[in-house]
Amino acid sequence: MENIVDMIGFYGLFALFFVNIVYLRKQQGYLWGYFIFIFVNEYLNRILKLIIREDRPHGYDKAVEVGNIYNGAHVYGMPSGHSQSVFFSTAYLWLVIESVPLLLIQLFVCGLTVYQRWKYKKHSISQLAVGGIIGILFANLVYYLIKKRIFV
């Protein structure tokens, strides 16, 4: 059971990416906006990591690490990219669809993702919280820009 939780937590951002694409497929303006800005969100995270330069917690567990991914901006932990991505996806889909059951499922995946990143000491609680807040704020900005621009 613990391995399933870890895998959902690790791959949560990919799962939410595909869920969002499926649910947004009939709303092309929002779909393209999401598709473009999820990648902008990733680069925003890298830029913030290079500006803030806060190290990851000491003693993080490399058990779920694939290769040496911690180079460049990924050496730093603030803000958490996983947290920022899952909360961006969740907030964006909520703003477009406003489905409570879907929101609860996505928040569950967000929770598992945050837990997994904290459990293996990839990030501190503050790094995870800041990542989540940035993801939510950026999703709101993107949603309102797209809504205004494409007159939805």
Which ranges hold each PLM region?
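Hydrophobic alpha-helical bundle signature of multipass membrane enzymes
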Residues: M1-M78, Q84-K119, N140
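Short, Lys/Arg-enriched, disordered terminal segments
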Residues: M1-N3, Y144-V152
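A cytosolic-side transmembrane-helix exit/cap motif
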Residues: L50-G59, H123-A129, K148-V152
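Alpha-helical transmembrane segments that form the membrane-embedded catalytic/substrate-binding core
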Residues: H82-V86, H123-K147
